[in-house]
Amino acid sequence: MKFFASCAKGLEYLLADELLALGASKATATISGVNVEGELRDAQRAVLWSRLASRVLWPLTEFDCPDEDALYAGVAELPWDAHLSVGHTLSVDAHVSGTAITHARYAAQRIKDAVVDTMRRQGLERPSVDVENPDLRLNLSLRKGRATISVDLGGGPLHRRGWRMAQNEAPLKENLAAAVLMRGGWPRAYADGGGLLDPMCGSGTLLIEGALMAADVAPGLQRYGSDVPSRWRGFDRESWQQLVSEARERDSVGRAALKQVIHGSDMDPHAIRAAKENAQVAGVAEAIWFGVREVGELQTPPQATGVVVCNPPYDERLAADAALYRRLGDTLQRVVPQWRASLLCGNAELAYATGLRAGKKYQLFNGAIECALIVCDPIAVPRRTPLAAPTALSEGAQMVANRLRKNLQKFKKWRAREGIECFRAYDADLPEYSAAIDVYQQADGDRRIFLHVQEYAAPATIPEADVRRRLNELLAAAREVFEVPAERVALKSRERGKGGSKYGRFEQRNEIVHVREHGALLRVNLFDYLDTGLFLDHRPLRGTMAQQSKGRRFLNLFCYTGVASVEAAVAGAASTTSVDLSATYLQWCAENLALNGLAGSKHKLMQADALAWLEAERAHFDVIFCDPPTFSNSARAEDFDIQREHVRLLRAAVARLALGGVLYFSNNFRRFKLDEEGVAEFAQCEEISPRTIDPDFERHARIHRAWRLTA
């Protein structure tokens, strides 16, 4: 059976891992939630134990729903006497998008009408509505003409743990607090004897959640007490009581063993008072020290290692202050230099203001507020401090240098033949030196070489000292082989296959380097962002499209910085149209066009959601490039999931092909599966992935997949 666990945007992969650990047979991340395969007991366990989920929804029915009559009819078909007992109350939460029914409240009312009318026809008592505490809470998801009716097994939002009696201004939801703690590695740090510190603790959410996590307390125990979360007739009460009994045993053992290693402070005495009251209700007051202190007065905890968690002020109600973030970063480097930090900041600029080097960055949403979560490990490494190269290469560095020279020799003829100036020189060829090294050669001036180094996340089993040593050796080898100084080496940290943010700033050098590919000049920014503005793996596909675009109309969907458009224009395209929702990327595209003398009415830039734009557009194009993201959750457009939406997207794109036109579709989602039958209904499709991989990416040829479609 399949069910759905919803969560805040940005927590999907973390929640999927949690649900698998809780016993689900399969958990697949999607936008704002996880599709789960498991039994009802697994769903009920998630209600009791998930620290990250917002709701757990057990589906009752799914049907096509083009209008309100179809919604009513679909709900009325269900045997509601099997779901709702006589005398019990009802409530409906509705979420609608991309449908003829535009008002969620109206949709909820139609569902209530259908349930009430069905039970009346069966001669049963009319159920009453209780919005706050219903016996049965239903959930409607109505998206693009497809309705799913589910039981909310938790009876409401799961972030409500039941201990919050008092709060300071702008409280952090408990499930988001759990994510900050998990990303910071708090469970492992506690097991290793480390401490937990929040120097701006407010009403104590992060610390209380951390204490309950350390004590192995199920989040749902205090929320439900001796009650059941739902009086849905299908709810397995016997299984629930077994789960609760097991959780109480673990609770008793965990609380008894809870160590006093948690420290919280805040400059506001009212906030500290609220934090103490909340900790008392949660039953962890003895484990947490709270005190009134300004950030700069922070004192070194007795634990040698641990995790700093913090949610500094940033929203409209609490004025953001870059100086405060700078003071926070300086204080942490002075007081707990060897600790780890997990900081939920208002945005990337505020994260940068801390002055800390973020090894990992994640994009999260605190309600409607987009935030940047940075993880620093350890705190004491400033972001702009260059790693010192040894005067002579160590044995390990010499191994890396030898492999780099071998790769350069291997690529020499290919680079000369194709005129390749930007390429991947190394990609974890030696597994213990796990990083990618990209070479960017300046196209103008003295044609200097820059290196872009992306460090992959090391397994937790490898000691941090070994990770740092190997990174130093790799950097030393790269600088020697390419004869570049440290200031021309951009170092980034990145996890393979994870959903971390690509858009957080790393440095604010604002240094633009001009490079050349397929005869086009391009602007790249190697230092300020995780991605540079040029995806090197798509080089051969861009070349193919440029050759085919001469004298023809070229369309670039999800255009990013417009490199494919620029190269098509340089090759002689009659016109180019570049579509992206981001004004920043469109500006970058415009600058790339201008750099090649191509600005003008022949080259259109469209700020729009690509799918919506396609479905409204009537013009035709000869060559179309479609390289969508895996997920997109912009506030300006509907949520996008490439696995779910690709047939609709490709259908709309193929409809814009001129006679004899060709569409190139690519994506880098490792688990993507093309719906061949769905696509075959409107296009001929051929996978061309091997032909779109150049020699420098053959080591990891699954970096992207590509298809050629014709009408």
Swiss-Prot record:
UniProt EC number: 2.1.1.173, 2.1.1.264
One Pfam match: UPF0020
Protein's cellular compartments: Cytoplasm
CDD domains membership: AdoMet_MTases, THUMP_AdoMetMT
Gene3D superfamilies tied to this protein: 3.30.2130.30, RNA methyltransferase domain (HRMD) like, Vaccinia Virus protein VP39
InterPro entries noted in UniProt: 23SrRNA_methyltr_KL, DNA_methylase_N6_adenine_CS, RlmKL-like_Mtase, RlmKL-like_Mtase_CS, RlmL_1st, SAM-dep_methyl-trfase, SAM-dependent_MTases_sf, THUMP_dom
Enzyme class: transferase
Single GO molecular function: RNA binding
GO CC entries: cytoplasm
Transmembrane segment boundaries: none
Domain THUMP: 42-153
Keyword field: Cytoplasm, Methyltransferase, RNA-binding, rRNA processing, S-adenosyl-L-methionine, Transferase
Domain of life, per lineage: Bacteria
SUPFAM superfamilies, per the entry: S-adenosyl-L-methionine-dependent methyltransferases (SSF53335)
Catalyses which reaction(s): guanosine(2445) in 23S rRNA + S-adenosyl-L-methionine = N(2)-methylguanosine(2445) in 23S rRNA + S-adenosyl-L-homocysteine + H(+); guanosine(2069) in 23S rRNA + S-adenosyl-L-methionine = N(2)-methylguanosine(2069) in 23S rRNA + S-adenosyl-L-homocysteine + H(+)
Family note: Belongs to the methyltransferase superfamily. RlmKL family.
Function in brief: Specifically methylates the guanine in position 2445 (m2G2445) and the guanine in position 2069 (m7G2069) of 23S rRNA.
Designated name of the protein: Ribosomal RNA large subunit methyltransferase K/L
Organism expressing this protein natively: Xanthomonas euvesicatoria pv. vesicatoria (strain 85-10) (Xanthomonas campestris pv. vesicatoria)
